[in-house]
Design a protein with these regions (language model features):
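Glycine-rich, positively charged N-terminal anion/phosphate-binding segment
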Residues: 7-83
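Single conserved hydrophobic/aromatic residue that forms the stacking wall/gate
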Residues: 185-192
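Alpha/beta enzyme core
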Residues: 74-85, 94, 99, 111-167, ...
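Short glycine-enriched, charge-decorated loop/helix-capping segments at active-site entrances
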Residues: 100-106
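Active-site beta-loop-alpha junctions enriched in small/polar residues
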Residues: 7, 32-34, 62-64, 90-92, ...
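N-terminal small/glycine-rich loop or linker at the start of catalytic domains
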Residues: 1, 38-41, 46-56, 91, ...
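Short, well-ordered coil/turn segments that N-cap beta-strands
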Residues: 1, 24-25, 52-57, 81-83, ...
Length: 192
């Protein structure tokens, strides 16, 4: 299926409906702060509200504290019942990464594991997915090893933005990062 990626300031209700009408099989909300969710911030909650015709739909959250991410995940599931919960490890924007959110997790893989495990354990009813970048910079590419780590924790799918955090949205995407992740994943399933 065609999957609409979560994009801040883009994937709002009208855009999601338009994409559904044009054939998108799965759509995602804009990414939202786990802190905003547990504080029940009305602006944050309005970003993730959706209507039944949008299903299947994923809600994407970000944060840097495993307990807060767990609480936010439970809240989202209980209040909204999305089909998928997605963790953002891909946002390169400094106002997010300075607080440890988004792609900042690529600098502390143990924390990434803890956050991911907390989310997976808090919503066993639905699949948890991850959107991430290839690494923090060209000297710290974490793909493909992180893909296997996340799968072992219980992540059901990974969306890879084949750029680094430092590249932000400029420069060439390195499509060579994707092939080893796909190949590693396929080989692991062949041997099971």
């Amino acid at each position: 299926p065609i999957i609409l990626a979560p994009m801040a300031g883009v994937t709002d209700y009208p855009f999601r409906i338009l994409c559904k009408e044009m054939g998108a099989g799965i759509v995602y909300s804009e990414f939202v702060s786990a802190d905003g969710i547990i504080r029940e911030n009305s602006k944050t909650l309005n970003l993730i509200r959706f209507e039944e015709p949008e299903r299947p739909i994923g809600i994407q959250i970000f944060g840097s504290d495993p307990e807060v991410m767990s609480q936010a995940s439970k809240y989202v599931f209980e209040a909204f019942k999305p089909n998928i919960l997605d963790i953002n490890y891909g946002c390169p924007v400094p106002k997010v990464t300075k607080k440890g959110g988004g792609s900042a997790a690529l600098q502390d893989l143990c924390l990434m594991d803890d956050i991911t495990a907390a989310v997976v354990e808090s919503v066993p009813e639905i699949p948890v997915t991850v959107k991430m970048r290839a690494g923090w910079n060209n000297d710290s590419i974490v793909i493909p090893g992180v893909g296997q780590r996340l799968e072992n924790i219980g992540v059901k799918a990974i969306t890879l933005h084949p750029r680094t955090t430092k590249q932000r949205y400029t420069g060439d995407a390195n499509w060579d990062y994707i092939k080893p992740v796909s190949y590693t994943h396929l080989r692991a399933h062949e041997t099971k």
